[in-house]
């Protein structure tokens, strides 16, 4: 399989800089505006209300789940509902104890600290975070060698909200210090339809119901993908100048242009399935081997591609590696000839 299929790709879960402003405008600001994840919303509402009644900061919270389900949005909502400001950072940006110390010492009383990809923090920073979360203080080492001393630094009370796509990589002592942990689930087509209806209203798009329904079923169970496909469909509607109202026919034409198929697979999804079939005879194949062949990070494949393919029944994980299913062969039109060479239509 030619690898140039991955060049200049547009992964539906990636957020480009020119889309951040639009995405921010579509973000719900309060729990009442947030569609889906009802159990998590109710639990967060209780957490926030209890903290207000007791006059303390909200408990630390860990939000886990695949990309694009609303972890960052929920963190911003928690800050808004608590009436406090939010400071945003990420695990890869906190690699030294000094990085974390500077961040924590600058927090205002009651402020919410959001750390995305918290599982990617360095171990030394994680260990400093234990004491900060539990006692609102950190120990600063002064001096070097045998004469070095530890000086305690008191911190303003704060709330930490961590987000992760790989909760299993967090050490137990860190997970245990979160007072609340939630896993966000993929959305149903019906929930995604509600997301699209709200976004279409904010974007002032006129539509027929079946147009949004056709986008919802192709949105991979992910609101970020749903909103991205809606923006791309709106672009197609404006450029084609064929109608002022978004119809199902126009939506499907836009999906064809952006290479999103009936199950919501994009180019990279199909490239993974093609690679396993063409190069590795349908599998099983190890993630490192697959990553090297595709020229794509293993973490991207594991976090952004595999969950949806597994959920759709197109891919299975076995002790020996990844393997495509009969459903994937049927959907992709893969064929095996009698000579043992595998072909696809």
UniProtKB/Swiss-Prot annotation:
It comes from Tropheryma whipplei (strain Twist) (Whipple's bacillus). DNA binds at residues 317, 322. The keyword Nucleotide-binding applies. Homohexamer. Forms an RuvA(8)-RuvB(12)-Holliday junction (HJ) complex. HJ DNA is sandwiched between 2 RuvA tetramers; dsDNA enters through RuvA and exits via RuvB. An RuvB hexamer assembles on each DNA strand where it exits the tetramer. Each RuvB hexamer is contacted by two RuvA subunits (via domain III) on 2 adjacent RuvB subunits; this complex drives branch migration. In the full resolvosome a probable DNA-RuvA(4)-RuvB(12)-RuvC(2) complex forms which resolves the HJ. The RuvA-RuvB-RuvC complex processes Holliday junction (HJ) DNA during genetic recombination and DNA repair, while the RuvA-RuvB complex plays an important role in the rescue of blocked DNA replication forks via replication fork reversal (RFR). RuvA specifically binds to HJ cruciform DNA, conferring on it an open structure. The RuvB hexamer acts as an ATP-dependent pump, pulling dsDNA into and through the RuvAB complex. RuvB forms 2 homohexamers on either side of HJ DNA bound by 1 or 2 RuvA tetramers; 4 subunits per hexamer contact DNA at a time. Belongs to the RuvB family. It holds the Pfam family RuvB_N. It is found in: Cytoplasm. Residues 262-345 are annotated as: Head domain (RuvB-H). Has 3 domains, the large (RuvB-L) and small ATPase (RuvB-S) domains and the C-terminal head (RuvB-H) domain. The head domain binds DNA, while the ATPase domains jointly bind ATP, ADP or are empty depending on the state of the subunit in the translocation cycle. During a single DNA translocation step the structure of each domain remains the same, but their relative positions change. This is Holliday junction branch migration complex subunit RuvB. ATP binds at residues 26-27, 68, 71-73, 134-136, 177, 187, 224. Keywords: ATP-binding, Cytoplasm, DNA damage, DNA recombination, DNA repair, DNA-binding, Hydrolase, Nucleotide-binding. One of its GO terms (cellular component) is Holliday junction resolvase complex. One of its GO terms (biological process) is DNA repair.
